[in-house]
Amino acid sequence: MGAVFVKICGITTEDDALLAVAMGANALGFVFAPSKRQIAPPRAADIAKRIPSEILTFGVFRNESPDRVVKIVNRSGLSGAQLHGHESAEETIWVADRVPRIIKAFAGGSAQAARANEWKSNPILLDAPAPGSGEVFDWTMAAQVPDGLRVVLAGGLRAANVAAAIQQVRPWGVDVSSGVEKAPGRKDVTSVKNFIANARAAWGELEDLPAPAPTPAVDPASLTSEEAPYDWRDSES
């Protein structure tokens, strides 16, 4: 069954990057979109150089021009791009053809998430409508994602709820930012350690459980409009 994929996002310092790696993270995220956790590409490149090659490094963008996304990822030596805005399927595919890896983020409960396979991103990231807000969305909405896509679950995850999230959603991976911080952009050692440990333990327990019962189809009327805003907010906590 393998191990759950764990991504620690919002990395702003080398110390936090090395901490996450030491605790067992599989991937790191550097936020280039406007945010309290925003980092300059040259600084992210410097940190990425000090990270073991087996650890994936993603640049997180929101509504950035595809050409600029490709240039920043490749010039910074990152493993891939995470597109966290209103990027179209065409834009996402264009970027995916020019960077090593791609992750497209969708808001849980959105109409786009229900047809996420059109973006040709696998895995995809399923987040709260307000990324970085620390808010948890209705996890039952994960059932709307088309079969065959690997889901990285995000949105308000922390050490205290990641096990429940994994047990309910059974995602391929989990992503956390504000849930393991002591201040915006600065990670907390204990929180990072406990988050990863709890995620690994919960994933291990899934091997002993029967497959979940089929989830009823999501009523399209319950999905948010394609034009609904996908706002980028930051948790104050």
Q: Which ranges hold each PLM region?
A:
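Conserved N-terminal beta1-alpha1 strand-loop-helix module at the mouth
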Residues: 1-237
